[in-house]
Curated annotation (Swiss-Prot):
HAMAP family: Thymidylate_kinase. Keywords: ATP-binding, Kinase, Nucleotide biosynthesis, Nucleotide-binding, Transferase. This is Thymidylate kinase. It catalyses: dTMP + ATP = dTDP + ADP. GO terms for biological process: dTDP biosynthetic process; dTTP biosynthetic process; dUDP biosynthetic process. Gene3D superfamilies: P-loop containing nucleotide triphosphate hydrolases. It comes from Salmonella typhimurium (strain LT2 / SGSC1412 / ATCC 700720). It comes from the Bacteria. Phosphorylation of dTMP to form dTDP in both de novo and salvage pathways of dTTP synthesis. Belongs to the thymidylate kinase family. ATP binds at residues 10-17. InterPro entries: P-loop_NTPase, Thymidylate_kin-like_dom, Thymidylate_kin_CS, Thymidylate_kinase. The keyword Cell division does not apply. PROSITE patterns: THYMIDYLATE_KINASE.
């Protein structure tokens, strides 16, 4: 399908929206303009309804969403987006810039929730097969910094209201996974914004040039 699926990952408040803008600007400077944007969960009618269910704290009233129900909703939304939007776009040579993908589930549910990692890997492989992003930019930020930024934006969703311990476990799993996969590039998002933007530009530029070589 070509090397044109880039995903941006990170904790709440890591700066994913700013990073997306920098990625787009960098790609355009490299002559790439045929792009679409996705977010997870979401991106299709079904996936957006699932997003509301899993993130809106009021969506199911007083009913507690179990950890396994949560992860299955994420995967239902993901496979719908991948099969109906992402794969068709990639097949047509369109670049896809994604706000989150499967790494989020491996980190949040595997790290934060403590769901068995073998089960998550099996579920991922059953649902997605060998489909993976070509490049993932992981914006690394401490929960203290990230949640301070997120809370400054206003209302928090169901997952954003989790404890610092939850986000520390999530971050630890992100870092562990990033160290295991060369397709994941870690960006220090605790730096001043100019430095973060510089690192993103440099990483994307180098990667695109490597793919073209």
């Amino acid at each position: 399908m070509g090397s044109n699926y880039i995903v941006i990952e990170g904790l709440e408040g890591a700066g994913k929206t700013t990073a997306r803008d920098v990625v787009v600007e960098t790609l355009e400077q490299l002559g790439i303009r045929n792009m679409i944007f996705t977010r997870e969960p979401g991106g299709t009618q079904l996936a957006e309804k699932l997003r509301s269910l899993v993130l809106d704290i009021r969506s199911v009233g007083d009913e507690v969403i179990t950890d396994k129900a949560e992860v299955l909703m994420f995967y239902a939304a993901r496979v719908q987006l991948v099969e109906t939007v992402i794969k068709p776009a990639l097949a047509q040579g369109v670049w896809v810039i994604g706000d989150r993908h499967d790494l989020s589930t491996q980190a949040y549910q595997g790290g934060g929730r403590g769901i068995d990692q073998t089960m998550l890997a099996t579920l991922r492989d059953a649902v997605l097969g060998d489909f993976r992003p070509d490049l993932t930019l992981y914006l690394d930020v401490t929960p203290e910094v990230g949640l301070k930024r997120a809370r400054a934006r206003g209302d928090l969703d169901r997952i954003e209201q989790e404890s610092f311990d939850f986000f520390n476990r999530t971050r630890a799993r992100y870092l562990e996974l990033a160290a295991q996969d060369s397709r994941i590039r870690t960006i220090d998002a605790t730096q001043p914004l100019d430095a973060v933007m510089r690192d993103i530009r440099a990483t994307v530029t180098k990667w695109v040039q490597e793919q073209a070589a």
